[in-house]
């Protein structure tokens, strides 16, 4: 596979054994530069609308980078300046799922993407 023309998106599931809180994300994706990707994060074990959802990412060998937050109850969002205009965070409360869409992808967007409560 020609990695110079594709962008790899990895996502991870976060769980808490004590409270059975789970955030289960969609699987890995490979996208071409300029494309968009939409990552899902399905919550269970708590009231989805009671806690903000944050999205962060981590590129290989780098630290965590905060992308933004969303209030699942109101739908209000706040995005890191770096991603303004490229990121959109939404939710579907009926299925307790949050979404993060990133557009105009570039090679630097290759990372593991996490949702966090």
Swiss-Prot record:
Q: Which residues are glycosylated?
A: 92
Residue ranges for the region (Complementarity-determining-3) are 116-117
**Disulfide bonding pattern of the chain:** 41-115
In alphabetical order, the GO MF annotations are: antigen binding
Instruction: Give residue ranges for domain Ig-like.
Output: 20-117
Where are the residues of the annotated region Framework-3?
A: 78-115
Stated role: V region of the variable domain of immunoglobulin heavy chains that participates in the antigen recognition. Immunoglobulins, also known as antibodies, are membrane-bound or secreted glycoproteins produced by B lymphocytes. In the recognition phase of humoral immunity, the membrane-bound immunoglobulins serve as receptors which, upon binding of a specific antigen, trigger the clonal expansion and differentiation of B lymphocytes into immunoglobulins-secreting plasma cells.
State the name under which the record lists this protein. Answer: Immunoglobulin heavy variable 1-8
- Chain's gene name: IGHV1-8
């Amino acid at each position: 596979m020609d990695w110079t023309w594709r962008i790899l998106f990895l996502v991870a599931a976060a769980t808490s054994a004590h409270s059975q809180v789970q955030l289960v994300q969609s699987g890995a994706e490979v996208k071409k530069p300029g494309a968009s990707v939409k990552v899902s994060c399905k919550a269970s074990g708590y009231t989805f609308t009671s806690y903000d959802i944050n999205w962060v990412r981590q590129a290989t060998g780098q630290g965590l980078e905060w992308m933004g937050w969303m209030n699942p109850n109101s739908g209000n969002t706040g995005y890191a300046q770096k991603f303004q205009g490229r990121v959109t965070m939404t939710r579907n409360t009926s299925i307790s799922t949050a979404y993060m869409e990133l557009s105009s992808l570039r090679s630097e967007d290759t990372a593991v993407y996490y949702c966090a409560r």
